[in-house]
């Protein structure tokens, strides 16, 4: 019938229009380099246009194979320099590669090959989480095109920078009972970092502003850097298991340093096994510290989302935007 013919024509036009929209979207995705900012198209799925599949991003097809997430870069000058790219996060998406780096002071990377490798990262911002005293002893190397910001990632309640001098440690431990294995010191240090941290506020400001690739680091890339990385992963929707695994990966990256410290204090450890973890933490991290951080956040704020909004201004809308920026 005439009505049936008109409906059939409208269906074909709708199918072709739908296919054209998908072609346009895939073109935009290709031009934007696989940007996650394009929302899913509403409506029913499009049929292939002229029996050809909808185009996918050529950039994604041409992308080189990536290593296992958390694999450190091979620098002669130091260990534990790695990125957050590749980790699974919100809605099963993954963190974009080459954007968020966690590492060590760039002054340690003095060799020609190390400098070339560092320069090739195309860093726009280096956030140094060390104290001013640490920075004066070993100032960072800043590649062309990058800018350096130094904000201590561990400060006392009065704003005084903690430099791990005896007086600073005593002030940090005020109100805590010292334990044989040193676990209370780690808890005091990590809990202090979680609240009112100006360095971490700058870190999230830079991420929201798209000031990437970014490198954040402390002296060994394990404690101040480790907590900062945990918070980024938390904000991007990674699971607790992923967050803890990245934190603990420091022990794999710094195995040689850990073994050396334990060997140096072998006699003392044999006489008093309880002190083993104290020495272990000098070069590595305590696996129990990451779950402690997550528990502390949720105990005070009820949820990670409440914490991120209260401490860093990441409202639900801003958090969603951050995830669109760094997940794919």
Model-flagged regions — what are they?
Residues 49-215, 228-328:
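Cys-dependent protein tyrosine phosphatase-like superfamily
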Residues 29, 33-50, 56-59:
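Gram-positive cell-envelope targeting signals
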Residues 220, 224-225:
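Ser/Thr-glycine-rich phosphate-binding loops at phosphate-binding pockets of nucleotides
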Residues 20, 27-29:
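Short, low-complexity segments with poor structural confidence in diverse proteins
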């Amino acid at each position: 019938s005439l009505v049936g013919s008109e409906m059939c024509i409208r269906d074909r036009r709708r199918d072709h229009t739908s296919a054209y929209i998908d072609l346009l979207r895939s073109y935009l995705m290709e031009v934007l380099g696989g940007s996650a900012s394009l929302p899913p198209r509403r409506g029913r799925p499009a049929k292939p246009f002229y029996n050809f599949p909808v185009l996918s991003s050529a950039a994604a097809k041409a992308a080189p194979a990536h290593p296992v997430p958390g694999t450190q870069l091979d620098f002669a000058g130091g260990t534990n320099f790695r990125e957050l790219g590749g980790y699974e996060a919100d809605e099963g998406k993954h963190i974009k590669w080459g954007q968020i780096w966690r590492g060590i002071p760039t002054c340690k990377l003095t060799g020609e090959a190390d400098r070339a490798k560092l320069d090739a990262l195309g860093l726009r911002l280096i956030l140094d989480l060390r104290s001013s005293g640490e920075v004066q002893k070993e100032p960072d190397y800043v590649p062309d095109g990058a800018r350096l910001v130094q904000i201590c990632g561990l400060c006392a309640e009065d704003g005084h920078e903690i430099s791990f001098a005896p007086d600073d440690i005593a002030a940090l431990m005020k109100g805590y009972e010292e334990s044989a294995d040193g676990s209370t010191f780690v808890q005091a240090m990590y809990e202090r970092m979680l609240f009112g941290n100006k360095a971490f506020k700058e870190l999230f400001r830079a991420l929201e502003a798209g000031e990437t690739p970014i490198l954040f680091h402390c002296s060994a890339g394990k404690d101040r850097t480790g907590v900062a990385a945990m918070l980024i992963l938390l904000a991007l929707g990674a699971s607790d298991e992923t967050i803890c695994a990245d934190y603990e990966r420091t022990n794999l990256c710094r195995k040689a340093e850990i073994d050396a410290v334990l060997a140096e204090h072998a006699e003392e450890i044999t006489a008093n096994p309880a002190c083993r973890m104290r020495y272990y933490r000098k070069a590595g991290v305590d696996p129990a510290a990451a779950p402690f951080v997550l528990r502390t956040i949720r105990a005070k704020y009820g949820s990670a989302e409440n914490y991120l909004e209260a401490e860093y201004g990441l409202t639900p809308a801003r958090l969603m935007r951050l995830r669109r920026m760094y997940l794919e």
